[in-house]
Structure formats: structure tokens, C-alpha cells
């Protein structure tokens, strides 16, 4: 079929579906109407195609309209409306139903789906917003509120607007993008990797990682027919799919109740339903009022409450990136995600496949709105594998999360009385099949998860914990059958065919005894046995709950559908409510038993006596005397730093979200250079300690602030610290030794954090093991010894997950069936104060470096040193670690930190002491002289490269003798290994042993070796010139300059200073913005984007907008979100901005687009809607701690006090610069001061930054723009994520010492302006 014949082609499918194609050429017309031939990328031009799967609802069975007369839908109207949406998203581009690429000329590549894969993640992310815009365009200004469900028999009732005459609206089931590339030159398939994400046109859409399917077209006139695959077959749905998952149940105690009441600090508690450990502590709610669906809903009115903070984690060999967060949604009730952890283990034979796998996880976590705070990359040597186990053909991952419950753990344990309860399905019942040849089975939508988390959090906060009867807690299996059983508890489910997904009922025949077996098989294969990324929520039926549920889920763009109602009989009953044509006599229902695993829980105790066999016996060839070819010490040491496991992780850390939630007190970057070497992370659960009881806060009622309300310091805050440990190079050979080393690494890393006692630490164990004969006994014995090891160390132990790397009962799994053994320890503990922590950057000159190993032995087996030496077989044996000594060592480190005897510290692991000291010197920008103790026997390289777990501490010279004396009194093994130097231009790294010099080189050379792998990975990013952008301008010590002395004001919210905070679809709850507004004294009101017209009244003085980059293409997401907000509230934002007594503040590219489209008055010669945010030159998401200069002449009222100041601030996003139709327009904004803030160099004398990454876009370094009168301000740097000083990764030198974050002054100046302009 050629392109012209598709102009009116609406291919009808089952259920009245049709796939409609649209084309967007990205070139200007050349001579004769032909595309111009350019020098870009093999002289390519690109045409973006859209394949839209519409459901016109004219036929079909089992849909929501079954049994009713369906209104006719005009496909032409839907097509024209969708083209209007594309013109809004892509202004200035031609949009049509016909391809403009020439037929029969040149050669083509296309990324069109061929049926082996499914639509990319971006396709699923934008479909809900496009559906909302489609409804608005077709219905015009008609406001229609349809009820979520309408089953009067179950207490649902009829909602407003039900039964009214409405315009029929087709449903957008999926939107798929494809590129067609045309060239006069010959292009081949192997160019696809280079071309996929390197298209320069602004209409080009960023790919989802793994979406590389460019193929040549045989006939240039043939356009690809997109095939939409939705749940074609069940995957991994066998009831015995993961028989090892039950093992953690053996190591949990279920006889302890959850403690309640008011306590100071936190208390370690145990969940009575699943035995997991957590910390009961005070949590903070930034706002208690939410305006949704034309009504203000309030919770208990208290800014804080008690909840449980806990951690989950799991190792996956084939599941999607965010599978853990779906399956663990109800572990301690419903929990918010405070921080994410990411670890990847793979082979070094194909680094680009490993990078592709890693990028998919980075994108999914970034789009979820939760910061990624910890992680690791373990690159294995494929030539050295344990006996009986081949090298892993594909990488596997560890995903962890720190969560905070907002309700107590719940399960439906008794029948429901009154109006009953209903089960709702959150998310899209969608399963993407594995792409042929792909690196992983599926890719999750982070945006969809963000909408689910934000919607449920808001619903529970507003409706109350009693509104939720139960949450899905399906830990062992992810099938819909298991999730329904978990959501229903002791009760059953009654549902109807009209409530099930179309895919589940499209092939059902009429219900009759003869068809019962076939229908049951269809429902099992297409629904009950399908693993779909959805969450089930059981809600008590009340009119208020239904109203809140409908409004909240529409606000956050979360798809929700009624799945059924609770019934007394514990079974699933499906009623056929289709048209009478399907009635053939007999019962019109089918019954299914509730899900019961085919294996008993808990497992039999006999497995505890099973023998345990180490995988690698201590005999030849693993104890071979051949130590490998000799190598120069210098090359070996630098080679260790170049190893992917040890080397710099900038290619990961600088391209994930690290702070958007505003609750992060420690992320991966530390020191003045923001180097990714942190040993632990920390999230804050109570960002403000509140005023002392003896002081009266100010309420902003008087012009002058009382003197006793001025404070020049910030209070300590409480939170939760986390640390990871893994030794997957050793674990496959010696599981017990590898597990103990991983536990030791996590505990010692956490000892550097500001925790109070080692007894507060809880270690979570995650395990993957091949399900072979005797596996249960081996795993049980291993976990028993790990738990005993933790008890000896004085820490608690949680076994969170145990997964089979090869599943039984279903043949080889899609991920290849590799026999993988993997182990990760994740330690966490409550901290009463986020200050007084030890970070790996050296702080002082002439300090002493002490090395405290966890064992006197030297570990070399499977070390990075042996891998660098090129040994084909690992030699030696693992080091033996005592649990009791580990606990004693951790307590000693805590004592040295508490007494201020140590000022910095770093854990010793991969790469040994040498790698740890090199990272400390680079992070602190200091010279370092390392002294190998002369009294040690053997090769000094063995001491420097030993990977025995331990800690390296920096102790001031004045405190060195006291520290050493204390360690000796506690019988702690301690080595004095070095002395720090000064910060000089030529920093040196020197290693000696007596008179022998082992290494002497400049630190620049050391840093170059350490960054080499990261630079290599950055080169293969989505930009041709990526290799030309280095980190040089970023890795300079920054200085600040203040125009005033920073302070904070002890205040309480003033109800007359009310600010509306916009809630946007697909975005997480704006915690950072609400925290900053409430702490600074504003009365913050969270407002749905559907209800702005009812909120922006005279009682509201300000509007705050904060969005996140929640899709793989920020430009598309920003344009769609802005179009949706303004179409739902026509003229509302423009009228609010035009009032003289209001202000607005926007943070991020999405907020800029919304306010710009609201006609923010910028300049008579430049309309705000003509200003656009431009992408970073890296074409990647950037997370940077950058210097920002406040224009001395800016009229911005928010920057009145900060004018002329140079301050560091977080800047995150893909679009971190501004563009205009002509460069002169922005130049005039800079001259007039409307360029309120600018990206700057390392100090004031450096001037505006012009090079990446200090200026991410390498254009005019404008970071903020204000209106002519200064009332409205949009920023690309996040002042809410820098509002507290504990959010700063490093406090720079300044002309005025910084003890309070100066960014608080932005909100204080806005208060002063509101007071001066109030009526």
C-alpha cells in the first residue's frame, strides 16, 4: 500500500477499531517540492509518523458500551481533531495524512513496528493526554462529568451527567511513533544505532531505550503498517514460576504487633502481616488541603503524622524496570517512594548492550519522579565463570526503594458491611511482549507509575485511611489472579464482562455449559494468568469516596477502572452482562477459585538440614600458582581505576534525578566537584523541626519581623540513611563468603552516616539463585548463616526477596535461562539529625589517613586487580570475616564520628585501599602521600589492592593520637597509611613503602584514568558531538558571593498569603514546592489542573507551577501538558497573570511552557509564547549543581534582596536553556534585567558560563526570565530543591559564611511584596 492510498484508509478491526496514520515532515520544501539534500547524517531527511489506534465503539463485545446502542462516530472528525493536536504540539510543522517523502527515489530506513514488538513507552505515556485534548476539541466548551462507574446494585449510584446526551468520542487505545529516513545515498541497517536518537529536527521524538528497530524498506513507497500488540499471550504466569520466592517467609517473625502511640525519634517495628521491619517515626505532610473537583478536601489538618519508613529490594533477571514498585506497593500499607536504588550486573564483553540495559532503568526511574540515590555497576569477566555455570548472556539488575507508609498495613480480614466495597484497577492493563533480539523483555512507564503513586497518596490523605480497605500485597507472583486474591483478602470478587479489559473478553463465546471450558481457558490465558503492571485498590463505597476518587485520578492523569465488587463467597464470579444475543440458555456466569500457590507456605523444615556445597572447591585450577603475566605497578594501579566497576559513574549519576522530591539530604555526589563517590544516601522524613515551644512564630501580619524570630542557623532534621553492599564477583564461587562481604560493606558504609547506634541498622538481603535440584536447601542454609552473621554484628536482618534466575515448570524463560547467582545487601537506619556525617572528600591539610580493615586477611580472589592482570582463573581464597568483629569495628567508627575525631571517611571495597584513597583525594581536591606500612610482609600491591572490606578515615593531626589510642583500647586493627596535602594547582599522588617509590604522578593523570570509562560511555550517547563535551568546566571548585547576610524567619502560615500549587497529570506530588512554601509562611493549596477557574480568585495571591521531565521526550510532554491545562481553563491563567496584585513562580521547562502560553508579559517586541526551552547539547537529562548569578538590575520581586549574588543551585532536566525567534530578543532581556538569573562560572570573576556542563545548552546562559514588572518569574534551576541547607551537596566558600540557605530569601521577598500590595 502506498502513502496516497492511506489518506482515507481506516482499517477496521475487532471491536470497531481502526489504525489511522499521520505524517509530519521535518524539512522545508526544496526545489520542485522535493526534500532538500543536506550534509547531515548521510544527507538524511526525517519524517515523523504517527500510528493511532482508535476504538470507535461501533461494534464488539464485552466493552463498556456492550448491551447499549452505540452512537455513530465520524472517523473524519476524529482525524481532523488529532491533526489539530499535532499542530499544537509541533507548531510550524506540516501535518497531514499523506507522506511527503518521494516514492521510487533514493533509499529508506524505518523504525516502524513489525509486530514483534509493541509501542514504545512514550506512546503509552502521551496517549492519556491526547485523549483528554481530543475530548475537549470534539466537545468544544461543553463540560461533561461522567461517573467513574455506575453499578447501582453495588452502591455506586449515578453520577452527575449520566444519561445526558453527549457527543460520541472515540477512544485512543495507543499512539505509536515511527521515523522514516530518506536519502539519495545508500544507507544500511547497521546505521540504525547511530541514527535512532540523533535526529536533529525538533519534531523528532526521543526513543525509549531498546527501541532500535530501524530496518530498510524494500519498496520506497511502502509505509510501515504498525501492529499494536496488547497482551497476546501470558508470560511467566505458571503458578510455580518462582518457587524460591517463598523462602524469605521462613526468616520473618509474624507474632509482633505494630506499635502505636507518640514517641520521640523512631522505633523499629515489625509488620504483623509479612514480618518485615521498618521504623515508626514522625512524617511530614506539606499541605492538608487539596482543591479537586470544585471542592476543597481537607485531611486531619495536622502538618505531621506517624508512619513507617521501610525498604524493599529485589534482583531481577527478566522483569521490567519498575516491577518491584508495583509488587511491593502495599508492604506497609500504601507507601510513598522517597528514593530509589539501582544496581546492574553484566558482562564486559558487550559494554554497549550493558549501557542500553542501564539506560532503560535510568529512564524508567527518572520518569517516575523519585530520585535515584544509590547504585552500583558490576562488570564481570566473562572468561572466568564458576564450574557448571556459563557467563550470563544478559545483564540483570537490582532495584531497591526507600518508602514511607501513609496508612497502617491493611488486609481485608472481615466481611464488609453497609454499602460494601469495590476493587479498582489502577494503570493500563498492558503487556508489551519481548522484542525480537531485545536486551530485555519490556520497558516500564515511569510516568504511569508516578501518576499512580501521586493519585493514591492524595486520595488517602484526603479521604482518610479508613476509605481504603486493602491494598495489593502480591509478593510471590504478579499475575492478576494473585493480585485479586491479595486485594480481596477473606472475601471474594463479583465482576462483569463489561468491566474486564477488551483483550480479555474479545474472544469469549456465549456462556453455556458446552463453552464453559473454552471460556475459562480464554479468561485464564488472557486475564487471570497475565502479569500486568497494574495496582489493585479496594475502596469502601461511599458517595464522598467516589467523588474524591474520580477527581483525584483525573487530576494526576491516572487510568482507573472498576474491576468488581467484594462478595461474601471467597471466589471470583464473572457475570455475562453483554447483549441478549449472547444468551443461549443456562447460567450466565463463570466461577474461579481464589488464587492459591501450588506450594505450601511456609516450606518444610527439612530443607534446613540440607547439605550446602560451595560452588568453587579449593583446588586446582582455582588455586593455581600462576599469578598472570607481570605488569608495571603504575599501569596496574591506573588500570584498576579504568575498570568499569571502579571507575567514575558520571555517565549515570549526572543523568538521573537526584533531588526533585526536595527530601534528599545525601545523594551520590559529594565534595566541591560533585563527584559520584558517596557511600550512603539520606532522605529526610521531617524537613522542618518546627519552632521551639518557648518561641512565638511570626505570622506576617505586621510590616516588621520581631527580632527574636530572626535565626542565623538551620535546625537539624531527621531522616533515613541507606547503603548498599554487593560482591557478585565472589558470590557465584563462594556464596557464603560473598554474602558476608556484601553485608560488611553495607554496614560499614552506614557507619559513616549520621546514625546514632549500630543496633538501629537493619540489613535487607536480596538473592537470585538458579532453581536446580537442591536449591531450596542451599539457599535456606545460606540465609540462615547470613542471619546469624548479622546477629553477631548486632544488626537486624530482613530477607526481602529471593528470586529464581531459572524458573521451573515453564521451560527456558525469555531472558535466556542463565544460571545466575547474585546477592545484594541493603542496610538502612533512622537518623535523628542529618548533620555531622562523614563524606569521602578530604577536608584538611596534614591530616592522617587511617585504614581499618574488617579482617586481617587480604582478599584477592576475583578482585579487580586479578581482572586487570588478565587472569583467566581466579586465585586465592575469600577472606574470613567475623560478625562480632564487624559490629565492634562499626561501633568504633560511630564513636570517632560522634567525638569529631574523624572528618571524612570512605568504605574500602572494589579496587581496594588504592581506589578508596584515590577517590578521597580527587573528591577533596588535595594531594595525598600514601605510606604502605613497612612492617607488613609480602608484596605492597597486595596490601593496596586487597578488597577486604574496611574503612579509610581522615583524622586531623591534632586528633590522630587520641583516635589511635581509642582504637587500640578497643582492639581494632588499624594502619596509618597516609598524610593529606594542600589544595594546590599541581596536586600530586605519591605511594611509597619506606624508601621505595611505587607511584608518583599528578592527580590529573589519576583522574583521567578514573574517568576514562565514563567518558567512553558518554561518547555513545544520543548526540553526534557528545564526545566533544567534557566535564572540565564543571569540575572546578565553586565559590559563592552574597549581597546580604542570609537568615531564616521563624514563622507560621498566613492564610491571607495563599498560593495555589498546580497539580499536573503524570507528575508526582510537588513535595519540594509545598515544603518551601509552607516553611516560609505561605498558605499553600494544592489545586487540580481541572479546577483552576474555581481557585484563582481574589483570595489567591500567587500561583506556583512545578513540572518534571516524565517522558522520554520532554518537548512533547511539555507541549501536551500546557495545551491540556489551557484548554481546560481557557483564559484563566492569562487573567490571573494580568492582575496587578498577583505573582507567579515556575520551576522547570514544563512550568515555563505553561506560564509562557499564559501570556506572561515579557516584552512588547517578544511574546512570551514565542520563547521556548531548548535542550542540552548532550541530548540527555542533566542533573547538575551549578552556579547561578542573580542579575544586578533585575526587576524580579522574588530576587529583590539577592540581586548581585552568586549562588549554587540544583538544575535538572533535558531542556535547560531558553531560545527565541532571534538571538537579539534574548540579548535585550539580558540588558533590561529581565534575564533574572544566569548560569555562571566557578566564581564572579569567571563571568557567564558558555561551555557545557556549566551552561548545559551552550547558548546564551539565561537561567530565569521575569516579566517586565517583575511579578512573574520562570526558572530552569530548582530553588525549592535548594531551599534547605541540608539539600546542598557542598557548601562553598563565600564572602559571607553560609549557615542558612540564601534561597529562602526568594519567598521572604514575595511575602514582603504581597504585604505591600494587599488591599
Curated annotation (Swiss-Prot):
Pfam families: AIRS_C, FGAR-AT_PurM_N-like, GATase_5, Tegument_dsDNA. Keywords: Virion, Virion tegument. The keyword Endoplasmic reticulum does not apply. The keyword Transmembrane does not apply. One of its GO terms (biological process) is purine nucleotide biosynthetic process. One of its GO terms (molecular function) is phosphoribosylformylglycinamidine synthase activity. InterPro entries: Class_I_gatase-like, FGAR-AT_PurM_N-like, PurM-like_C_dom, PurM-like_C_sf, PurM-like_N_sf, Tegument_herpes_virus_N. GO terms for cellular component: viral tegument. It comes from the Viruses. It is found in: Virion tegument. PANTHER family: PHOSPHORIBOSYLFORMYLGLYCINAMIDINE SYNTHASE. This is Probable membrane antigen 3.
Amino acid at each position: 500500500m502506498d502513502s496516497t492510498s492511506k489518506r482515507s484508509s481506516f482499517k477496521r478491526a475487532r471491536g470497531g477499531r481502526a489504525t489511522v496514520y499521520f505524517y509530519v515532515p521535518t524539512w522545508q520544501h526544496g526545489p520542485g517540492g522535493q526534500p532538500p539534500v543536506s550534509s547531515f547524517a548521510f544527507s538524511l531527511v526525517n519524517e515523523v509518523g504517527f500510528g493511532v489506534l482508535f476504538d470507535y465503539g461501533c461494534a464488539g463485545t464485552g466493552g463498556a458500551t456492550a448491551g447499549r446502542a452505540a452512537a455513530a462516530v465520524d472517523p473524519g472528525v476524529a482525524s481532523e481533531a488529532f491533526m489539530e493536536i499535532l499542530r499544537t504540539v509541533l507548531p510550524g510543522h506540516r501535518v497531514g495524512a499523506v507522506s511527503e517523502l518521494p516514492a521510487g527515489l533514493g533509499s529508506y530506513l524505518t523504525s516502524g513496528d513489525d509486530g514483534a514488538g509493541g509501542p514504545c513507552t512514550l506512546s503509552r505515556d502521551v496517549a492519556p493526554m491526547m485523549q483528554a485534548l481530543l475530548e475537549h476539541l470534539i466537545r468544544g466548551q461543553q463540560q461533561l462529568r461522567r461517573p467513574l462507574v455506575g453499578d447501582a446494585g453495588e452502591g455506586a449510584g449515578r453520577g452527575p451527567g449520566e444519561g445526558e446526551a453527549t457527543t460520541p468520542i472515540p477512544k485512543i487505545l495507543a499512539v505509536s511513533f515511527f521515523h522514516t529516513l530518506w536519502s539519495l545515498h545508500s544507507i544500511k541497517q547497521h546505521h540504525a544505532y547511530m541514527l535512532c536518537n540523533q535526529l536533529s529536527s525538533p519534531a523528532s521524538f526521543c526513543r525509549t531505550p531498546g527501541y532500535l528497530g530501524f530496518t530498510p524498506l524494500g519498496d520506497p513507497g511502502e509505509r510501515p503498517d504498525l501492529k499494536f500488540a496488547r497482551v497476546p499471550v501470558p508470560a511467566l504466569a505458571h503458578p510455580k514460576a518462582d518457587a524460591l520466592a517463598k523462602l524469605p517467609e521462613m526468616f520473618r517473625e509474624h507474632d509482633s504487633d505494630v506499635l502505636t502511640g507518640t514517641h520521640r525519634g523512631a522505633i523499629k517495628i515489625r509488620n504483623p502481616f509479612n514480618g518485615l521491619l521498618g521504623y515508626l517515626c514522625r512524617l511530614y505532610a506539606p499541605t492538608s488541603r487539596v482543591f479537586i473537583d470544585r471542592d476543597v478536601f481537607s485531611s486531619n489538618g495536622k502538618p505531621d503524622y506517624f508512619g513507617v519508613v521501610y525498604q524493599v529490594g529485589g534482583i531481577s533477571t527478566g522483569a521490567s524496570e519498575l516491577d518491584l514498585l508495583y509488587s511491593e506497593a502495599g508492604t506497609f500499607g500504601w507507601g510513598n517512594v522517597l528514593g530509589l536504588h539501582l544496581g546492574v550486573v553484566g558482562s564486559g564483553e558487550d559494554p554497549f548492550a550493558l549501557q542500553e540495559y542501564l539506560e532503560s532503568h535510568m529512564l524508567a526511574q527518572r520518569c517516575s519522579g523519585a530520585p535515584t540515590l544509590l547504585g552500583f555497576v558490576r562488570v564481570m569477566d566473562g572468561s572466568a565463570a564458576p564450574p557448571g555455570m556459563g557467563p550470563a548472556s544478559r545483564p540483570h539488575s537490582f532495584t531497591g526503594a526507600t518508602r514511607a507508609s501513609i496508612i497502617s498495613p491493611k488486609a481485608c480480614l472481615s466481611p464488609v458491611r453497609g454499602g460494601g466495597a469495590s476493587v479498582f484497577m489502577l494503570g493500563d492493563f498492558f503487556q508489551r511482549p519481548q522484542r525480537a533480539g531485545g536486551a530485555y523483555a519490556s520497558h516500564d512507564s515511569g510516568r504511569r507509575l508516578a501518576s499512580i503513586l501521586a493519585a493514591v497518596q492524595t486520595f488517602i490523605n484526603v479521604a482518610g485511611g479508613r476509605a481504603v480497605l486493602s491494598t495489593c500485597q502480591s509478593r510471590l507472583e504478579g499475575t492478576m489472579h494473585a493480585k485479586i486474591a491479595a486485594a480481596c483478602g477473606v472475601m471474594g470478587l463479583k465482576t462483569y464482562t463489561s468491566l474486564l479489559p477488551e483483550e480479555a473478553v474479545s474472544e469469549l463465546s456465549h456462556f453455556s455449559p458446552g463453552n464453559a471450558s473454552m471460556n475459562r481457558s480464554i479468561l485464564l490465558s488472557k486475564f487471570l494468568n497475565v502479569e500486568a503492571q497494574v495496582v489493585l485498590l479496594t475502596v469502601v463505597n461511599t458517595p464522598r469516596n467516589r467523588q474524591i476518587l474520580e477527581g483525584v485520578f483525573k487530576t494526576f492523569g491516572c487510568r482507573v477502572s472498576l474491576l468488581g465488587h467484594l462478595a461474601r463467597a471467597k471466589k471470583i464470579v464473572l457475570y455475562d452482562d453483554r447483549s441478549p444475543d449472547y444468551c443461549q440458555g443456562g447460567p450466565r456466569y463463570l466461577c474461579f477459585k481464589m488464587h492459591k500457590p501450588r506450594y505450601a507456605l511456609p516450606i518444610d523444615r527439612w530443607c534446613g538440614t540440607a547439605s550446602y556445597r560451595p560452588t568453587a572447591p579449593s583446588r586446582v585450577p582455582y588455586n593455581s600458582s600462576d599469578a598472570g603475566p607481570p605488569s608495571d605497578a603504575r599501569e596496574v594501579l591506573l588500570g584498576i581505576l579504568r575498570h568499569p566497576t571502579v571507575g567514575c559513574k558520571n555517565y549515570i549519576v549526572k543523568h538521573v534525578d537526584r533531588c526533585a522530591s526536595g527530601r534528599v539530604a545525601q545523594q551520590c555526589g559529594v565534595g566541591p566537584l560533585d563527584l559520584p563517590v558517596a557511600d550512603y544516601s539520606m532522605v529526610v522524613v521531617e524537613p522542618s523541626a518546627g519552632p521551639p515551644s518557648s518561641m512565638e512564630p511570626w505570622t506576617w501580619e505586621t510590616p516588621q519581623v520581631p527580632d527574636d524570630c530572626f535565626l542565623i542557623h538551620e535546625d537539624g532534621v531527621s531522616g533515613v540513611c541507606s547503603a548498599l553492599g554487593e560482591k557478585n564477583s565472589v558470590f557465584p564461587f563462594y556464596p557464603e563468603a560473598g554474602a558476608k562481604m556484601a553485608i560488611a560493606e553495607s554496614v560499614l558504609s552506614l557507619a559513616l552516616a549520621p546514625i546514632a547506634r549500630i543496633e538501629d541498622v537493619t540489613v535487607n538481603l536480596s538473592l537470585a539463585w538458579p532453581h536446580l535440584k537442591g536449591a531450596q536447601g542451599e539457599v535456606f542454609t545460606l540465609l540462615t548463616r547470613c542471619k546469624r552473621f548479622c546477629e553477631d554484628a548486632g544488626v537486624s536482618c530482613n530477607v526481602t526477596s529471593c528470586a529464581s534466575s531459572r524458573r521451573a515448570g515453564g521451560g527456558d524463560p525469555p531472558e535466556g535461562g542463565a544460571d545466575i547467582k547474585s546477592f545484594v545487601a541493603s542496610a538502612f537506619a533512622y537518623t535523628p539529625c542529618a548533620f555531622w556525617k562523614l563524606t569521602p572528600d578530604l577536608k584538611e591539610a596534614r591530616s592522617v589517613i587511617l585504614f581499618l580493615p574488617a579482617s586481617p586477611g587480604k582478599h584477592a580472589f576475583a578482585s579487580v586487580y586479578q581482572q586487570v592482570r588478565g587472569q583467566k582463573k581466579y586465585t586465592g581464597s575469600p577472606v574470613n570475616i567475623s560478625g562480632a568483629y564487624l559490629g565492634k569495628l562499626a561501633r568504633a567508627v560511630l564513636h570517632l564520628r560522634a567525638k569529631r575525631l574523624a572528618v571524612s571517611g570512605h568504605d574500602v571495597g572494589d579496587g581496594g585501599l588504592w581506589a578508596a584513597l584515590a577517590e578521597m583525594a580527587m573528591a577533596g581536591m588535595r594531594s595525598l602521600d600514601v605510606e604502605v606500612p613497612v612492617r607488613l610482609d609480602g608484596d605492597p600491591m597486595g596490601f593496596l589492592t586487597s578488597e577486604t572490606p574496611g574503612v579509610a578515615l581522615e583524622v586531623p593531626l591534632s586528633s590522630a593520637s587520641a583516635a589511635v589510642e581509642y582504637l587500640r583500647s578497643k582492639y581494632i586493627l588499624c594502619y596509618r597509611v597516609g598524610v593529606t596535602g594542600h589544595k594546590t594547582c599541581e596536586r600530586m599522588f605519591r605511594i611509597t613503602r619506606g624508601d621505595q617509590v611505587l607511584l608518583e604522578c599528578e592527580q590529573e593523570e589519576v583522574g583521567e584514568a578514573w574517568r576514562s570509562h565514563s567518558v567512553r560511555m558518554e561518547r555513545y550517547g544520543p548526540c553526534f558531538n557528545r564526545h566533544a563535551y567534557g566535564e572540565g568546566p564543571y569540575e572546578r571548585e565553586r565559590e559563592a558571593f552574597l549581597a546580604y547576610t542570609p537568615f531564616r524567619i521563624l514563622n507560621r502560615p498566613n492564610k491571607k498569603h495563599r498560593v495555589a500549587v498546580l497539580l499536573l497529570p503524570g507528575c508526582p506530588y510537588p513535595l519540594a514546592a509545598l515544603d518551601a512554601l509552607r516553611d516560609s509562611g505561605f498558605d499553600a493549596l494544592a489545586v487540580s489542573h481541572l479546577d483552576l477557574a474555581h481557585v484563582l480568585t481574589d483570595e489567591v495571591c500567587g500561583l506556583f507551577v512545578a513540572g518534571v521531565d516524565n517522558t522520554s521526550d520532554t518537548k512533547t510532554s511539555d507541549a501536551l501538558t500546557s495545551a491540556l491545562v489551557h484548554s481546560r481553563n481557557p483564559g484563566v491563567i492569562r487573567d490571573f497573570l494580568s492582575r496587578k496584585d498577583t505573582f507567579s513562580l515556575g520551576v522547570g521547562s514544563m512550568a515555563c511552557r505553561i506560564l509562557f502560553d499564559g501570556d506572561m508579559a515579557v516584552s512588547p517586541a517578544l511574546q512570551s509564547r514565542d520563547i521556548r526551552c531548548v535542550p542540552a547539547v548532550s541530548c540527555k537529562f542533566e542533573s547538575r549543581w551549578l552556579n547561578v548569578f542573580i542579575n544586578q538590575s533585575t526587576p524580579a520581586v522574588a530576587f529583590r534582596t539577592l540581586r548581585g549574588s552568586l549562588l549554587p543551585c540544583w538544575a535538572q532536566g533535558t531542556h535547560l536553556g531558553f531560545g527565541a525567534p532571534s538571538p537579539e530578543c534574548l540579548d535585550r532581556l539580558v540588558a533590561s534585567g529581565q534575564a533574572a538569573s544566569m548560569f555562571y562560572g566557578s566564581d564572579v570573576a569567571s563571568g557567564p558560563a558558555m561551555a557545557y556542563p556549566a551552561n548545559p545548552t551552550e547558548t546564551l546562559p539565561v537561567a530565569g526570565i521575569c516579566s517586565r514588572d517583575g511579578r512573574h518569574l520562570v526558572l530552569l534551576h530548582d530553588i525549592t530543591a535548594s531551599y534547605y541547607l541540608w539539600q546542598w551537596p557542598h557548601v562553598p566558600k563565600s564572602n559571607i559564611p553560609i549557615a542558612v540557605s540564601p534561597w529562602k530569601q526568594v519567598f521572604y521577598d514575595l511575602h514582603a511584596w504581597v504585604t505591600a500590595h494587599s488591599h
